């Protein structure tokens, strides 16, 4: 064979695009090409692997069709976490970004337990990651090291969310949401709950109905939705929320909530019913009523908000025990199941549009 013939033979690609894709797929599966990292450009890959640019391009497109990588404008192909298989021990991560307030511990405990149950039914594991006191880079590195296959996050911190998404990890917001969010979210149906509670009180003949809760001004969307539901429920019943009977303060401040509740119920023209649609606020309203000698059900009606018990657990009595007329009830188990379902869908098709899913609520009358 002449030197010219030898050169021509050596320039012909010796591998197909499918073979190159197999090699890259194996490296992604083993984690040597980590989620969030970028592959070499088509030209660099062709040169490294001694294949034509066309072969490299076809291999990359094949991996993209399998949702193992995604093309990003002017940056190249980023590795996704789809190769981090939960059936092979890669965990789902629950990133708790906001430390639980004293009144919210039951929420976080219920949600973590529900996620563990939902993952366990599929034979999967759950990794809990606390954000408090840790830089974002440390949280992201923990997810990378564990090869998390998806992340359930409770935060509205856009910097944290973007850092996790850059790993190629599917992200679902759990009971957190903001307008134009690039992430899927699963939330309690606060609007429907507010409507149910307000309509129930109006149906019992109440006309002086108070609202006790977080200040909706500048609040997150879930606070605004619950407040708006209460206003809408009254409007459907031909009533309006009296500004003079609207007691709002900062969420997570039990002392401020206690002051608001006591001031509301100690006035000469006190309300005959109170919408306290957060556990902490319902607790303080019930305490204030008790200290003022008012009996719930006789002197006023009080509607709160609570979680339904896990299967096999004792029946829930809510934030204020039996001292409530009714409660809006939602299921952490349903929220957890929908979060995992959405992660599975996102893993299968990373290009789906972001969605907002609402967990149904119901009104339960006490006593």
Which residues does each predicted region cover?
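Extreme N-terminal segment that seeds HTH/winged-HTH DNA-binding domains in transcriptional regulators
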Residues: 1-54, 58-61, 84-85, 356
């Amino acid at each position: 064979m002449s030197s010219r013939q030898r050169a021509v033979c050596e320039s012909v690609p010796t591998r197909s695009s499918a073979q190159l894709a197999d090699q890259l797929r194996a490296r992604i599966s083993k984690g040597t090409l980590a989620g969030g990292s970028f592959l070499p450009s088509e030209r660099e890959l062709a040169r490294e692997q001694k294949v034509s640019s066309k072969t490299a391009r076809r291999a990359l497109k094949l991996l993209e069709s399998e949702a193992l990588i995604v093309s990003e404008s002017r940056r190249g192909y980023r590795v996704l976490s789809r190769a981090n298989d939960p059936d092979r021990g890669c965990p789902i991560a629950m990133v708790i970004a906001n430390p639980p307030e004293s009144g919210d511990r039951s929420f976080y405990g219920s949600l973590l337990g529900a996620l563990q149950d939902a993952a366990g039914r599929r034979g999967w594991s759950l990794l809990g990651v606390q954000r408090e006191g840790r830089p974002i880079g440390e949280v992201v590195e923990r997810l990378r090291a564990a090869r998390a296959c998806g992340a359930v996050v409770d935060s509205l911190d856009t910097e944290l969310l973007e850092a996790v998404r850059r790993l190629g990890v599917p992200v679902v917001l759990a009971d957190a949401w903001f307008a134009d969010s690039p992430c899927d979210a699963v939330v309690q149906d606060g609007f429907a709950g507010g409507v149910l509670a307000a309509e129930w009180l109006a149906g019992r003949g109440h006309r002086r109905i108070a609202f006790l809760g977080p200040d909706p001004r500048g609040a997150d969307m879930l606070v605004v939705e619950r407040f708006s539901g209460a206003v809408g429920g009254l409007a459907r019943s031909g009533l309006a929320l009296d500004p003079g009977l609207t007691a709002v303060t900062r969420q997570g401040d039990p002392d401020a909530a206690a002051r608001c509740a006591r001031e509301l119920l100690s006035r000469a023209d006190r309300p005959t019913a109170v919408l306290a649609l957060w556990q902490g606020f319902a607790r303080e309203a019930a305490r204030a009523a008790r200290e003022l000698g008012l009996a719930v059900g006789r002197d006023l009606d009080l509607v709160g908000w609570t979680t339904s018990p896990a299967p096999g657990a004792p029946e829930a009595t809510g934030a204020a025990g039996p001292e409530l007329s009714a409660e809006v009830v939602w299921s952490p188990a349903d929220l957890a199941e929908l979060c995992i379902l959405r992660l599975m869908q996102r893993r299968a098709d990373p290009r789906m549009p972001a969605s907002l899913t609402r967990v149904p609520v119901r009104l339960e009358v006490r006593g």
